[in-house]
């Protein structure tokens, strides 16, 4: 009888303590540019991913793309920290053999083409401390415009002809 009373008292104390602790937490609000992940293969049933990118998704909110990602300037390719591209196997990128591992993704927007940069400096806030000597690889890609506007910056992967293409979209590009 005493054991049961002791156990009931203990359980009640734990429940009250946990309830009080949870209600006392001060959780941060959702970030204005929430994190997202794009992976290949994109099918959620496929657990053997070949690559993934973690990035933040800024939104236009009435602003222009050229104001948020100015032409000719290094851009963090999203918001907050520079995106982190993780390769789970070796890949060729513009003729360069990239070893499996993680790389920062930066870009230089342009009117007709963008330069995509894979960089060794991880965990970098924005592109403020960018050093060209830490570039691993660069490639220039043409700008393709569309009539539809995309409010939030987005990244997706697609396989074509046994290659994996990364698509980045924001506003009308």
Spans of features found by a protein language model:
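Bacterial Sec-dependent N-terminal signal peptides
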Residues: 1-27
């Amino acid at each position: 009888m005493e054991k049961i009373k002791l156990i009931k008292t203990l359980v009640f104390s734990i429940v009250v303590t946990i309830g009080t602790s949870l209600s006392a937490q001060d959780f941060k609000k959702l970030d204005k540019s929430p994190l997202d992940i794009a992976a290949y293969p994109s099918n959620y049933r496929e657990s053997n991913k070949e690559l993934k990118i973690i990035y933040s998704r800024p939104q236009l909110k009435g602003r222009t793309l050229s104001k948020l990602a100015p032409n000719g300037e290094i851009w963090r390719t999203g918001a907050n920290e520079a995106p982190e591209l993780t390769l789970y196997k070796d890949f060729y990128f513009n003729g360069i053999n990239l070893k499996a591992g993680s790389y920062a993704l930066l870009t230089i927007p342009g009117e007709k083409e963008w330069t995509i940069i894979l960089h060794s400096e991880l965990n970098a806030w924005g592109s403020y401390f960018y050093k060209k000597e830490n570039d691993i690889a660069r490639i220039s890609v043409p700008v393709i415009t569309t009539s539809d506007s995309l409010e939030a910056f987005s990244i997706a992967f697609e396989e074509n002809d046994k290659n994996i293409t990364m698509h980045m979209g924001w506003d009308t590009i």
